[in-house]
């Protein structure tokens, strides 16, 4: 191991710790990820790993191309969700969730979150559901339980869908899993991770909710009609659901399907303004919505994925994968450990490292396309973030929105989330052992 390899590893470790301690350092993790990426590639370029500028450029462009498929997918998905949200497409959810009993509302919120998270990302789903929950639940003590279950349900719902979580998107784009494979094999473990915590919380909620007001949600703001709202919702959410089908039928990368849905949705909304003034700058026109996309998140993924690519290029991840196989040798334990660690640190770099550690079809049956390790990794990395409230983007956002303390979540939710997590792994093992 030469000096530059040690320097690259040191930069990655320091950067990783800075990202994990973002709440303490108050330095945005996107800035850290980008600097980490540039410094690591700089050491790679000067460390003599490749000969000549042409080989160096080929290495950078090849990895950038692989990373770009995930970034374009995320940007397209974020744009679609933003459009649907601004067109009040999720307003119908509020009507569906109306209930008198606290227990009844718990199950409605839980299942709606679980289902929405399978087609939207868990972060967006959590934000949407928290905003709706606030209109339905007045007592703060109850809201803490509902909000926590939204986190658990969102993470569980995203784990079995190829488009439901950033990590599953990464695995799907990387060719480690297929849409049909991850849905059919991971849905039962995901349900276990969702249903067991829900059943336990069900016993702790008693009584009825205050009657809801009769406020109409038939018409959105900014002059949006109910028809326009419904069209945008069907095209947006229906389009997201159709992306795996598009990928299977055409063989094109998933990001092409996402961009086609985004283009169709953009075109449709422009047609809605056909008879209006061309200079109309309505807040819901796509050109006005694009600046609302979270570019900081996109740059974070760019920095992380390209940094991990450097570690793969210098052979560190392959060596680490071989060491884990020799010392542990059990794909269930490796995936379970990664999931548990993801409750403390960001799961994106963890999954990115695992993808580079185990090349497809070169490390045994568990690591082939739709192999048990990749399916377990999809489940564990997604649901492991529910164990601690800081373990997922959804948890961190809900923590801020509802002012949930780390201590309250740790005492009340961590034990039941851990029980659901372990039950999911056990159910996956039983399904494959039979």
Residue ranges and their predicted role:
Residues 7, 139-144, 160-161, 170-171, ...:
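Juxtamembrane and boundary regions of transmembrane helices in multi-pass small-molecule transporters
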């Amino acid at each position: 191991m030469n000096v530059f390899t040690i320097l690259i590893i040191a930069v990655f470790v320091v950067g990783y710790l800075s990202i994990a301690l973002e709440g303490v350092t108050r330095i945005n993790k996107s800035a850290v990820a980008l600097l980490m990426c540039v410094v690591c590639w700089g050491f790679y370029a000067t460390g003599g790993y490749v000969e000549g500028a042409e080989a160096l450029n080929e290495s950078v462009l090849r990895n950038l191309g692989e990373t770009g498929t995930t970034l374009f997918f995320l940007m397209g998905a974020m744009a679609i969700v933003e459009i649907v949200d601004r067109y009040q497409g999720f307003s119908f959810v509020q009507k569906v969730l109306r209930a008198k009993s606290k227990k009844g509302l718990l199950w409605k919120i839980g299942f709606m979150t679980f289902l929405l998270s399978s087609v939207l990302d868990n972060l967006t789903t959590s934000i949407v559901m928290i905003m709706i929950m606030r209109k339905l639940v007045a007592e703060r003590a109850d809201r803490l339980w509902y909000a926590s279950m939204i986190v658990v349900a969102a993470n569980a719902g995203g784990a079995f869908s190829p488009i439901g979580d950033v990590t599953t998107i990464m695995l799907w784009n990387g060719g480690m899993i297929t849409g049909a494979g991850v849905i059919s094999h991971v849905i039962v473990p995901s349900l276990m991770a969702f249903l067991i915590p829900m059943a336990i919380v069900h016993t702790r909620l008693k009584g009825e909710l205050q009657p809801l007001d009769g406020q109409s949600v038939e018409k959105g703001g900014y002059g949006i009609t109910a028809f326009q709202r419904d069209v945008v919702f069907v095209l947006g959410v229906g389009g997201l659901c159709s992306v795996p089908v598009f990928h299977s039928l055409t063989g094109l990368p998933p990001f092409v399907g996402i961009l086609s849905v985004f283009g169709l949705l953009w075109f449709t909304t422009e047609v809605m303004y056909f008879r209006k003034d061309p200079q109309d700058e309505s807040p819901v026109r796509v050109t006005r919505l694009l600046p609302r996309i979270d570019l900081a998140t996109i740059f974070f993924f760019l920095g992380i994925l390209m940094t991990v690519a450097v570690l793969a290029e210098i052979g560190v991840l392959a060596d680490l994968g071989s060491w884990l196989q020799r010392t542990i040798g059990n794909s269930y334990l490796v995936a379970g450990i990664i999931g548990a660690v993801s409750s403390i640190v960001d799961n994106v770099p963890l999954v990115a490292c695992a993808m580079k550690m185990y090349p497809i079809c070169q490390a045994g049956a568990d690591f082939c396309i739709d192999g048990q390790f990749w399916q377990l990794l999809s489940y564990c990395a997604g649901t492991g973030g529910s164990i601690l409230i800081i373990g997922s983007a959804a948890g961190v956002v809900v923590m801020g929105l509802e002012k949930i303390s780390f201590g309250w979540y740790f005492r009340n939710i961590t034990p039941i989330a851990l029980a659901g997590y372990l039950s999911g792994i056990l159910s996956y093992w039983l399904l494959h052992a039979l």
